[in-house]
Amino acid sequence: MLFRRKKTIMRLCRILLLTIILCLAISPAAAYTITEFCADGYAEGDGDEYFVLDGKGSLASWSVTDGEGTVSFGGESGRTVVARNGELYYQIHNSYPDLEIIDSTPKVPNAKVSKKFQMANTEDGLTLLHNGAAVQSVSWPDDVEKGNGRVHRFENGVWDTRVFKIGQSDFEPRTFTADKVTLFVSPDCSHEVITGVIKEADDTIIISMYEFTSVSLAESLADAERRGTEVTILMEGGPVGGMSKDEKGVLNYLSRAGVDIYTIESEGKLPARYRYLHTKYLVADSMVTVVISENFKDSGIPKSGSGNRGWGAAVEDSGVAKYFTEVFEDDLAGYDIYSWILGTEQFPEATESDKAVKVFKPKTITNCEVTPVISPDTSYLIGDALNNAKSSIDIQQAYISHYSDSENPWLSSAVRAAEEGAEVRIQLDGMYYNTDSEADNDEIAADVNRKGLKNLQAKILTDREGILKLHNKGFIIDDELVLISSINWNYNSPTNNREAGLLIESEEAAEYYTNVFNYDWEGVVLDNPASAAVGFDIRFILAGAVIAGLVVLYIWRRRH
């Protein structure tokens, strides 16, 4: 009996050993993968084209072919970057590859190449071989979409889960529990919140901004620099229509005050990493992060109280501040960054509107969850939030446009939520440039309303006292989730721009912005414990007078 047991144990041991040997024998077939490549680079002759192998163990038995030439390996192991020209790769990526195909620099070893290995831009393919047998293949345009500067990534068994361009970041989403968040809106109270943060900063202020022409904010930042606060600003160098004379004057003024200013922009044939730096945020003292939908302009952050409708939040949390600082530093480290060159443009004169309507005051809430949203890295969080909506969605957008080959997916998600029973309201800007063409806000609103759902409405904001235009890019979902962002609802903004936003999970935050939304929707503050003395709106006074007059007339007639 004992002998049989020993024999059985020995048999099991032999089976286990054989299984281990087989696993070791077959594991190399899955040990390496092509995880990234760029066939159409920015350097001359596509010298910066490259591919990346990821895995463990020796690469000696591995090779990559494009169907014409083959790259083989020696003693390399682990993640290995193979570029066509190491020096040109360095000029674009600011780091050298592990191997190069063309001998360009002694800093990079040469790869073993047979015949001509060069990826074609429009139609080609790569095949990974192990001991001469194919284990992975990818081709374009069949498997991935071709394009200049397109970087293709293989993650979780799928190619290109998002559009990547050379030099773009890949930040993961993180959620923080913020100690304190101050909610505010433009035009009512954004200026006081932002200047307050600037005035309280002692050590550092970093700003990432699309446009900057505000005289008062420039003066506040210059004062901060003079008192010893280190101020650094990153600007979009080529906004739509070009950088204005006033903006150049503001940046000259700040530069003379000692502020470090940089621009991100295309240069010649070398495109910037992002179509536009469209962000609007600042971080003070590595602790307070301000994210807003508005640019630093008199219309966006008005001192007088009259201007664009926009939403913002100042988050007091070191984790959120660190996250945005890392994004800022990544943006500042790219090949497309240029120091500001002092020009002759003069500091513009301050302009103030004679209309000062301040309906809403800032409101501070505590202990709420905050998730940064960064485009193009984590734009998908917006779609996820819309797809998870259950009871209500209030959307306030400067504009919504469909994609060239499909409907806007975020709008489709909102409509689908309404079809499933959620109350959905969509408010869009009514300025002429958002309503003049044949496929802009008024057509979008009409299409939404034509669906005939009582719980789905779309409106155009055309007239609210003190509001010049609707420039917001936010929503409120299920009375508990708020989006504050710079992200427009088009293809380019979430896909190609650098953008910034916040998802705030808080019933108090949702209530605050719902009150603002209701005011814009109906012209009435339904419930706003955070509002200032709302003041008297002449429209309501007149309406009340008319009603009172009718009541008096009715009573008089009854008595006579």
Where are these regions (language model features)?
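N-terminal secretory signal peptides that target proteins for export/translocation
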Residues: 1-11
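Juxtamembrane/start-of-transmembrane alpha-helix segments at the extracytoplasmic/lumenal side
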Residues: 527-544
